[in-house]
């Protein structure tokens, strides 16, 4: 069984955890929360342990949090980073790389430049085999994923005929 921590419990993280929580091969170790809002109680009411950045614990004093994000990561095999855009790169450097923990990042991050979270933008239809063995992978947004699922079969079947794709 894989122990998975979802770091970020907003519009993306709350959906991800609802999807993975019933998988018999996954144990959800908890969720990371960055802002002390109603989503904290929402996660707790749904039975999830909530962890917050150690430096922000005082801001969450009105909530029944389970500890700091660092301790949750120490108990996890994989983290799905659904934190606010740009925070994933900071988390990678501060938390994930020092712990050598496998990480999947949401579409608000980048695969380009010095703040790149990965060199791979994952799409199961396009580069599934390339993701095997990677420590850090970025999952594209729903729009990017959808385009990959449509465009990859076209590229595969009509590679010599297609000069370019225009997507609007």
Predicted ranges, named:
Residues 1-168:
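N-terminal Rossmann-like NAD(P) cofactor-binding subdomain of oxidoreductases
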């Amino acid at each position: 069984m894989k122990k998975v921590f979802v770091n970020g419990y907003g519009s993306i993280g709350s959906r991800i955890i609802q999807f993975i929580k019933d998988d018999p091969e996954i144990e959800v170790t908890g969720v990371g929360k960055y802002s002390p809002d109603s989503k904290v109680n929402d996660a707790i009411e749904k039975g999830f342990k909530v962890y917050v950045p150690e430096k922000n614990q005082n801001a969450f004093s009105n909530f029944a949090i389970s500890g700091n994000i660092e301790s949750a990561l120490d108990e996890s095999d994989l983290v799905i980073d659904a934190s606010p855009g740009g925070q994933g790169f900071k988390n990678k450097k501060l938390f994930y790389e020092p712990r050598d923990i496998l990480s999947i990042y949401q579409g608000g991050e980048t695969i380009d430049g010095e703040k790149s979270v990965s060199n791979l933008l994952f799409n199961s239809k396009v580069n599934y085999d390339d993701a095997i063995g990677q420590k850090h992978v970025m999952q594209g947004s729903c729009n990017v994923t959808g385009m990959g699922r449509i465009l990859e079969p076209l590229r595969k079947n009509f590679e010599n005929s297609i000069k370019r794709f225009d997507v609007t």
